[in-house]
């Protein structure tokens, strides 16, 4: 019985780690949801290459919401940025991977 519980706990943990955890956002709801979905897609597609994932997010955001978007993806960074109001999203994905997306023109 203990083995079955361990597998269930592991499955629950993996399921929790596949959803983005938003730490801070001042984006409008619709933009935030689209950006979160884009971040999840990019991080899953380029799971071994954060630079390619960031490039995909930046290029898509530039096309969809105008230019001057910036993206940082990593496991160990801090940031202090200047950004346009209602254009910032900071989230965690996969447990330890942080994604920061902001617009600054």
Curated annotation (Swiss-Prot):
Changing residue 35 to I: In MRMV3; uncertain significance. One of its GO terms (cellular component) is plasma membrane. It is found in: Cytoplasm, Cytoskeleton, Cilium axoneme. One of its GO terms (biological process) is microtubule-based movement. SUPFAM superfamilies: DLC (SSF54648). Keywords: Cell projection, Cilium, Cytoplasm, Cytoskeleton, Dynein, Microtubule, Motor protein. Belongs to the dynein light chain family. Consists of at least two heavy chains and a number of intermediate and light chains. This is Dynein axonemal light chain 4. The gene is DNAL4.
